[in-house]
Amino acid sequence: MILCAGESLIDMVPSDGTFRPLAGGAVYNTAIALGRLGQDTGYLWPISRDPFGDQILRPLAEAGVNTDLCPRTDRLTTLALVTLTNGEARYSFYDEGSAGRMLLPEDIGPLPDTVTALFAGGISLVPDPCGGTIEALIAQHHDRLPVMIDPNIRPFFITDAGAYRARLARLMPMADIVKLSADDLEWLHPDLSPEDAARAVLATGPKLVLQTGGEAGAKAIWAGETVHAPAVRATVADTIGAGDTFNAGVLASLDRQGLLSKDAIAAITADQIHAALTLGAQAAAVTVSRHGANPPWAHEMPA
């Protein structure tokens, strides 16, 4: 089971002059996408008992995602106000004292033996206590489980850039795979080109650094020659959840190829990487073709 640990929230998405509440969150979207693609998936994050919490749980159940590690709480659900400019999403978060933000280490029980990989990232890595809790989870299990991290950096959400950079500096060496957008790479290394920035991240310890660039497609920076997979053409409705779905496609491909182990990732080949990037791009193309974070089901994917 691929365990996705990180935020779920309600995206307040513009709709006919008002806002429509949609369940979302970077790591949550990846969990939903993995479940819809047919992968054995678990989710770890506190879920509020408010009506929005019930709205968050329904798509997880529909996608077959295991939520046994999701504690219920009376704290309120995080809200993200979404604004769209030419289909590009920007977010304002209402998160103080929310259900997810207050995740503590004691809220997480022992991981079941069925967990075979760990995915984490998003805004859940920024504030405490939840950021420290996710960091501790990764620190506890990274020696045994392959770890993929997508920080999905939101500069406007970061109140202490130094502390956040320090957390990422601790997390990236524990990860086997790190996914970063061009914006993420610029924030991390503003004086470097995107590829040099990706190689700087690779030098900290991951075996793969995946760089996404929208229409430019995706690249994998690793010990071998750079692997590139072109973007899949799509009529873009909006980009909400595109990167999250890409992550799910990559993980699903690695799982199907029998590569979701630390040893297998360390010995991965260019062809295997290309297959993973391609499935990620194909899945993301479906998501951007429709409004909101609505990743594809397995039957909607190319044969």
Locations of regions flagged by a protein language model:
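Active-site metal-binding loops of divalent metal-dependent hydrolases
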Residues: 8, 26, 123, 151, ...
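Conserved beta-alpha-beta core of the PfkB/ribokinase-like small-molecule kinase fold
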Residues: 117, 123-199, 206, 216-217
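Conserved phosphate-binding/catalytic region of the ribokinase-like
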Residues: 190-303
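Conserved N-terminal subdomain of the carbohydrate kinase-like
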Residues: 40-123, 147, 303
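Short, conserved phosphate/pyrophosphate- and ester-handling motifs at nucleotide-, phospho-/glycolipid
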Residues: 34, 181, 243
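Glycine-rich phosphate/adenosyl-contacting loop at the front of the ribokinase-like
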Residues: 1-66
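Short, glycine/acidic-enriched loop or turn micro-motifs at the edges of active sites
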Residues: 10, 14, 49, 153-155, ...
